[in-house]
Amino acid sequence: MGKPWLRALQLLLLLGASWARAGAPRCTYTFVLPPQKFTGAVCWSGPASTRATPEAANASELAALRMRVGRHEELLRELQRLAAADGAVAGEVRALRKESRGLSARLGQLRAQLQHEAGPGAGPGADLGAEPAAALALLGERVLNASAEAQRAAARFHQLDVKFRELAQLVTQQSSLIARLERLCPGGAGGQQQVLPPPPLVPVVPVRLVGSTSDTSRMLDPAPEPQRDQTQRQQEPMASPMPAGHPAVPTKPVGPWQDCAEARQAGHEQSGVYELRVGRHVVSVWCEQQLEGGGWTVIQRRQDGSVNFFTTWQHYKAGFGRPDGEYWLGLEPVYQLTSRGDHELLVLLEDWGGRGARAHYDGFSLEPESDHYRLRLGQYHGDAGDSLSWHNDKPFSTVDRDRDSYSGNCALYQRGGWWYHACAHSNLNGVWHHGGHYRSRYQDGVYWAEFRGGAYSLRKAAMLIRPLKL
């Protein structure tokens, strides 16, 4: 039997090899053996990671080669930059040489011209004298200045060209954006365009041969006037029509008054411009003192198209126009007046044939601005037809304050502020079209549907209010 320690060594070597093959944790062992004399072969078994592999060597060499290639690429790029710079310098040198040759040729021409002016005997080598030499130097300086100015102009042209290209690109971008927005507006879900239905139109009402009363005729048109288109304007503001027997000159009796009815009770029986105290302000209004007992405050008048009623909320709130012509008293002043007590409303109408009509409401008031000056009306009486009760309890709407019941903007379609529903049976603040019947995409005239229909623009209209208790 052999030596026991030798067998133990062989067993340990076999166990180490099996553990390495089975993926056991790698360990190192140190064996101290007594000196022996071996006659056979000695074998070694250990983990494969202790021996160098060709793949590791190839990876390190590849990394080194990549580093060298990277350095060479950097050198090549640097050489390319230097070559480009040299090319630019060479181009500038060629341009300077060309410019120098041009200047030399120009100087030669100038010298020849000076020699020609000096006389026929002066040759190329002749002495031109001090004065021609000074002139030549001056011309040379002018040439240099002109060249410098040309270079500056070229630089400015280049800058302007760059700016023009930038602006052209910006315009192109904005045009494409506008086109895209036009395709999307008014946009709905999924970017699909929502097409709003056209505003409802009032059916054309047959002409009603309504006889104009004497009071209405005196109020709206005491004397014939020339018809004017809406594009024509008067040179002088037209005075409001006056009853017969009184000069049509605006007057300002002593005031201010609470309303026109108070001025009437104080003995002022002439119609004209009066000053009323409305809240903390004093406003000028037209008081009609001879129509149905007087005391009427004119809050709206249309007669010649001299005032544009297609305006904003603030203008309708404060008022605009002149009280002795076309004007709108203002939503806030009317609210202040009607908040003092019960009022009645009288609407006077006249067509282009001189026929007049009236609509009377035994109750009229406006709510405050917090409720958008909502309209409150009483019972209707008259011969014009009731085209305003449909607007009862409706807020006032303008092009910039859309309060109507329509999905679109009635004030935009009908070109004026009004107590719109969806949209209107009347609108006395529309466009003053000349001649009655008019052509327009929408019903945007001065109309009262029950009197001449929605496609007929009236010649004159007025709205007057008065306290019920005089």
Swiss-Prot record:
- Give GO cellular component annotations, separated by semicolons: collagen-containing extracellular matrix; extracellular exosome; extracellular space; secretory granule
Residues in the signal sequence: 1-20
Record-annotated Fibrinogen C-terminal domain positions: 251-469
Question: In which compartments does the protein localize?
Answer: Secreted
Q: Which cysteines are joined by disulfide bonds?
A: C260-C287, C410-C423
PROSITE patterns reported for this sequence: FIBRINOGEN_C_1, FIBRINOGEN_C_2
Q: Which InterPro entries match?
A: FIB_ANG-like (IPR037579), Fibrinogen-like_C (IPR036056), Fibrinogen_a/b/g_C_1 (IPR014716), Fibrinogen_a/b/g_C_dom (IPR002181), Fibrinogen_CS (IPR020837)
Query: In UniProt terms, what function does this protein have?
Result: May play a role in the wound healing process. May promote epidermal proliferation, remodeling and regeneration. May promote the chemotactic activity of endothelial cells and induce neovascularization. May counteract high-fat diet-induced obesity and related insulin resistance through increased energy expenditure.
Question: In its UniProt entry, what is this protein called?
Answer: Angiopoietin-related protein 6
Top-level taxonomy: Eukaryota, Metazoa, Chordata, Craniata, Vertebrata
